[in-house]
Amino acid sequence: IVESPKKEIEKSVEEVYAPQTVNDELAEKIKTYLKTDYLKNDIAILEETDRQFQFYEIDLNEDGKNEIFINFFTRYFCGSGGCTLLLLDANLKPITKFSVMNPPLFVEKTKKNGWSILLIKDSGVFKELSYNKGKYPSNPSILEKAPYDAPSGHAEILFSDEYSKAKIYTY
């Protein structure tokens, strides 16, 4: 009887991310923007574990250019009510800095003022964020309850590990 040598078979389990969250070239531009502009006064005090973000590219106003949501989810950017999210245009110019947000974020196909309606759950109820005068409302906790109890079945779900897992980048 001849025994064949045992072969180790390595299985590589690769994370599956939503494609709108994976763009290493864009991530490098975002890192530069965060370090040299948006967080330039904070960067020296940020711990290594706080230097993480996720992003999601989506065209909110049908202009053919993706806006970019940046999700800050580490301790430095989060408080008891939620975390900071940033919305940038395609040129990395700020549109809205959201405070106290707890993803997932729902982007509806319905538009108001030419931009997608956003929904976020806050204190157990959905809040509608509508674009007005160049930005979205920055603090959903002060908004009234949305006129409906759930997002539509057509909403795009952002920053959800179940529906749109986002790649984590460090800077």
Task: Please report, for each region that a protein language model flagged, where it lies by residue.
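Acidic, small-residue rich beta-repeat scaffolds with periodic aromatic anchors
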Residues: I1-E25, E108-Y171
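Short consensus segments that form the blades of beta-propeller domains
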Residues: A44-L46, R75-S80
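Acidic/hydrophobic-patterned starts of short beta strands in beta-sheet-rich repeat architectures
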Residues: E62-F73, K112-I120
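A short, surface-exposed interaction/processing loop segment used at functional sites
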Residues: L86-P104, N139-P147
